[in-house]
Each structure stands twice: as C-alpha cells, then as structure tokens.
Amino acid sequence: MRALAPSFRLLAGLLLLIVLSLSSANAQCNFANSCTGVELYGYILRGDCINEDGHPHATSINLNYYIGNDNGRLEYPGESFGSSCVKTALNDGHTLTASCKGADGQYHDSSMDLNYVVGNSYGYMEPCRASNADHVLKSSSE
C-alpha cells in the first residue's frame, strides 16, 4: 500500500494542476461575476473589479480597440465600432447595445454580451483570449 502512496500523490497533484489551469482559463471572461458599479462612458467600460487580495480595484477598458462593426452588427474580435455605431448603451451591467451602420447605409440595432469580450484579471478589465471569441464572432441584430 505504501508503494501506491507516492503515485497517488503525484496523480492527485497533476489532477489539481489541470483543474486550476481550466478554472483560470475560464476566469479570463465573465467580468460581471467579479466587477461592480460597471458603467459605459462612450466606448470606455469602467467598474470596480476584485483583485487577487479580494479588494475592489477601479479599472477601465476601451471597447473601441476590441469590438468592430460588420455590416450593422457588433463584432468581436474587431475594432473601431465607434466610427460607425451610435446610441451605445450598457444594459444589465454586461450587454452592449448600439445602432450600427450597415452596407445598405441604414442603422441596425445590435447587442453583444460583454462577458464574452471582457474579463477580470487580478482586478483589471482585460479582453478575453481569442479562443473565447468563437462565442460572439457576430452579435445579434434585433
């Protein structure tokens, strides 16, 4: 039985590392779970996000660097949605809404869940990794 103990400890340690790495990968998004007082000022998302010590940290991110407009629809990854989208607003603390100009010259209402775009990294709002972009390559048009 003692011969199994070191192998079991090694296996348990490896399993713990795998679980921790998976949970940290998921922690890159869903900023709304750990950020409060979130508001949108133009293209700047601001709020207080919990840091590694468990304390709130005032932080912001310029969404214009990470979100674009594809024919009247908000798109991530992308950039410069602000040049062709108007009436930007934040609903429910995590849903970006805007009216974006399409190829037809008309404006189309669009929305995007920012939990797939923004994460909390040690108290700082940061863009999600590109692998998470598969969830929101194109946003919904209403």
Swiss-Prot record:
Keyword check for Transmembrane helix: no
MF term (GO), any: carbohydrate binding
Keyword Repeat appears in the UniProt entry: no
InterPro entries: Cyanovirin-N, Cyanovirin-N_sf
Extent of the signal sequence: 1-27
Alphabetized UniProt keyword annotations: Disulfide bond, Lectin, Signal
Cysteine pairings via disulfide bonds: 29-128, 35-49, 85-100
Pfam families named among the record's database cross-references: CVNH
Family membership noted in the UniProt record: Belongs to the cyanovirin-N family.
Function text: Mannose-binding lectin.
Stated name of the protein: Cyanovirin-N homolog
